[in-house]
Amino acid sequence: MRILAILLMASVCGISCSHSTDDFQPEAIVALERGALDRWGKGDPQGFFDIMASEQTYFDPTTAKRIDGQDALKKYIAPFAGKIRIEKVEMIDPKVQRSGDLAVLTFNLVDYGAQMDGGPKTTARWNSTEVYQRLNGSWKIVHSHWSYTKPVLKE
């Protein structure tokens, strides 16, 4: 009887332990991004740096080329730190697609009342792709790509 109980407990532990190692929740990735966006809207870029891998790559409409690594990205972002204010951030239709230790988050973003250094308030509309990788048990951004939604193109 004792052997049967031990085997039963070992089986239950094996099943529950194997289940918990791959307990992926897409909303956890979305929550990481929302938290970073909320801090960014208060002028604090550290929310993004906290969830980025050290070797992250980055594009946005104002970069001349890809930015490689968090140190280079911090230098690029430094002039904006503390100067950006956004009244309301709306993340539209976030979608997380995952394969193994990689997850891709895509969404549209609307920044209402976006203001740079006390200048005029605007509404900014973005497309975003964030590639997350599970590193040492935590999801980190390894690549960011931001573009304007329906940008005005010169002929």
Labelled PLM ranges:
Residues A5-G14:
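Bacterial N-terminal signal peptides
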Residues C17-D50, T57-E155:
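A beta-strand edge to alpha-helix "cap/lid" segment located at domain peripheries
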